[in-house]
Amino acid sequence: MRKEEIQAEHKRLRKVKKNADAGQVRAESIGKSSQTPMFRNYLTGVGPLVKPIIKRNDYLREFSKFEKDNASAMQKLLVEAEELPKATAQNWNTKREAKIGIIADRFLYESLEVAADFIPITPENFREAIPQTDVLLVVSAWRGLNEEWVNLPRRTSGKRELLEKTIIPFTKDQGIPVVFYSKEDPPNYESFVSMARLADHVFTSAEEVIPKYRKDIPDGIPVEPLRFGVNYKIHNPLGSMRHMGREMVFAGSWMSHKYPSRAASTEKMFDGALRAGLPLYVVDRNLDLDPKSFKNLEKYMFPDRFVANLHRPLPHDELLRLQKLLPLAFNLNSVMGSQTMFANRVVELLAMGTLLISNYSAGVNTRYPSVAIMDTELDTQQFLETLSDDYLRYCQVEGIREVFLHDTAFDRVDKILNSVGISTPTDDHRILVVANSQAEFEQFQQAQASDFECTYVPSSEASNIKGSEHGDLVIFANRLEAFGPDIINDAVAAYRYSAPDALYITAFDSEAEAYEPTTHDNGISKPATAYWINAGEMVDDATVETSMTIKSSFTSNN
């Protein structure tokens, strides 16, 4: 056989194999689709038939059969979410006085801005703005706050050259330290590492790449991990226990060509939720992409068995409200082996009182034990089918506490400022524990899984307590239902996202309405469990203007 004939035969066989592989994928997809509620609805005459989807037009055509009903269901949830309370103040942390120049994308900027005075740096304002700052924070940004840093990841772009050859040297000439933070490690390490070479201090989202930085940047530049943090005004649990439904809303993109492991996890968890009978809405961020601007849109299509669950993209603020309203959510990590790099929605959703169902992440598994890690479709199905209201509430409480003790914007900003020698306030507040006796105080103290120091106040002297300079937390141990291990931690966490005059602390499985700020015109009639007293103030139920009930990790069955 001649060489040309052999090559032609190889080409034909490759085509046959490609078609066979595609056929196998299609057969598996049809097999799974035939087991979904969507297909059962078709067989019983309740819903339309979803035909096999090959092209983008097929995808949109089949989606149109379900668009109206899904949009209506989501709109009802959005109306409910619109009534959720908003956080406007917290008592524990003071805004840092440092002025931080920042180059970042909007989500990262908004996650930090509450903690200090941030000044956005642009290609136009840097000469005037940078001399006003104490430090320049350069973040691995894709577009900036208002498109001013588009193309920054491209090492040959004009914006990159301006930053590295003009702005950073200009900053150092002013005697202002430069901090670089890569939130894109490890997948986009190479795109931004040249910025790290110019910094005085480097932070990375993935501690596993620190050895690479040691090799690639000059000796003497410190490198540390830095996880994502939350802005309490955006991510908080206020109103998070109103809604008792089990709807699940996932907002994201299908990118199996780039993240095959994540795509496989997505299918398993979505299939498990549908088998468990939960309403699932998939906000497809790529659904409205213009085919004139993007090629091969088929690679962004979710598997056709999920087309009945699709919803068009939603504004970010609406998604935030939905996520805060709903007690359950999926999280999909693209990076699974890192102890510090995982989806930022992990800390955001936990802060909003969400029980998170996630694929595996080493860091999530280590740091957030309340997150339900799912490996298979059956895991997901059985977890959701057996999930009790009590366990749901327990996980919500655990997540809220963990994030607001360790993962706030103040925690992250303090680490950034301290890295270049800028001191930050310690936010010291006395924690005064009122008990009927020294023995009762010691019993309470020994039960706590807390590092916070607390001071004993005999109940006979409670009326004489006055707030110190920065305000104090007063806990009445003699009013508690039980000495759960997290009373102090939960109270402190509450004052990192809210500012009520009084707190009622109850069991996670109690019937009490929780995380709902309440105003009072004439004080409170029922004495509270804890109080915040500002400098010179005293505990006085008659002057309490705001209160809130929170839940803790003890059970009402004690």
Briefly describe each language-model feature range.
Residues 207, 484-550:
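Conserved catalytic core of nucleotide-sugar-dependent glycosyltransferases
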Residues 113, 196, 220, 299-316, ...:
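Catalytic binding pocket for nucleotide-activated donors in carbohydrate/polymer assembly enzymes
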Residues 66-82, 171-276, 407-408, 413, ...:
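Catalytic core of nucleotide-activated saccharide and alditol-phosphate transferases
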Residues 37, 41-44, 51, 58, ...:
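C-terminal amphipathic helix plus adjacent low-complexity
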